[in-house]
Amino acid sequence: MIEKIKLTQFTKSAGUAAKIGPEALAQVLCQLEITWNENLLVGLNTNDDAAVYRLNEDIAIVHTVDYFTPVVDDPYDFGQIAAANALSDVYAMGAVPLFALNVVCFPAAYIDVLKEVLRGGNDKVKEAGALIAGGHTIEDEEPKYGLSVTGIVHPEKVIKNSTAKPGDVLILTKPLGIGVINTAIKGEMCPSETYLLAVEVMKYLNKEASEIMKEVGVNACTDITGFGLLGHAYEMAFSSGVTIEFDKDSIPLIEGARELAQMGLIPGGCYRNKKYLKGKVCIKVEEDEVIDLMFDPQTSGGLLISVSEEKAEELYRRLNKKLKFGAFIVGRVKEKQEYDIYVR
């Protein structure tokens, strides 16, 4: 039965493209009263990747939750991708994951399929050096899976998205194009080589990238997921009080993604991201499929790291030596200008 199941056919939208758009989400969150505590080091105020709560002078808890609908048809791969995506928030904060809880919404008729999803998630968490400690399930006709992840970090070594500094160099650790490729997968229009490459990109942990950036020392970091490169860069720029400038020609793309974008296989999340970022992003170059892919919602995307120019060469060299998909210098941090983001 497992071989006959195509998980993506159960869903309306795939992966992080299924997120509520940033514009709608902002309208909800702005009405919430933000409660604060001196030990809550990172909360709702900066749209960061995870919450951080200080327990004592040496330990802070980093906590996040992330789950979504299937992005691929193979249940084991889906489990691995969902786990890698959830763990990424902890890595972006410079923390070490300790344990995770499964979050499951699944049709009861496909328990054998669910077993494979959970096996994939468990294997990826094990690869991260963490543990699955339990979870929660809901019966649902549209499958969803992910994790609630808890990690730790020294309170003075938290890497936030709100501390980028003018003069910093921006380095991205995975190529873009996942949202477009996932749309092609769901429509059964994705070439097999592009499909297989995208699966490998999504399954790849940001663990080594996080370890290297901690050793080198960086100013800020965020992971690139549902709001796309430009959406998450906007959160970094706005929270840091700076402007970010991207070089369009330096943007890395998964092989085959550009061609799929040219075919018009653009996910709805891309258009939601564009709408939200209107007036915040200034495109100074021809708007083509590369620009679409900069708005494209990613699933288990890479880290966007803001590092001082003095340390950028070392970080770039070490990341490229270690990471499976390399690292790419994609832009710079500038003093605050009229727009939060420029693409040149």
UniProtKB/Swiss-Prot annotation:
It holds the Pfam family AIRS. The active site is at residue 16. Its EC number is 2.7.9.3. Its cofactor is Mg(2+). It catalyses: hydrogenselenide + ATP + H2O = selenophosphate + AMP + phosphate + 2 H(+). GO terms for biological process: selenocysteine biosynthetic process. GO terms for cellular component: cytoplasm. Synthesizes selenophosphate from selenide and ATP. Homodimer. PANTHER family: INACTIVE SELENIDE, WATER DIKINASE-LIKE PROTEIN-RELATED, SELENIDE, WATER DIKINASE. Belongs to the selenophosphate synthase 1 family. Class I subfamily. This is Selenide, water dikinase.
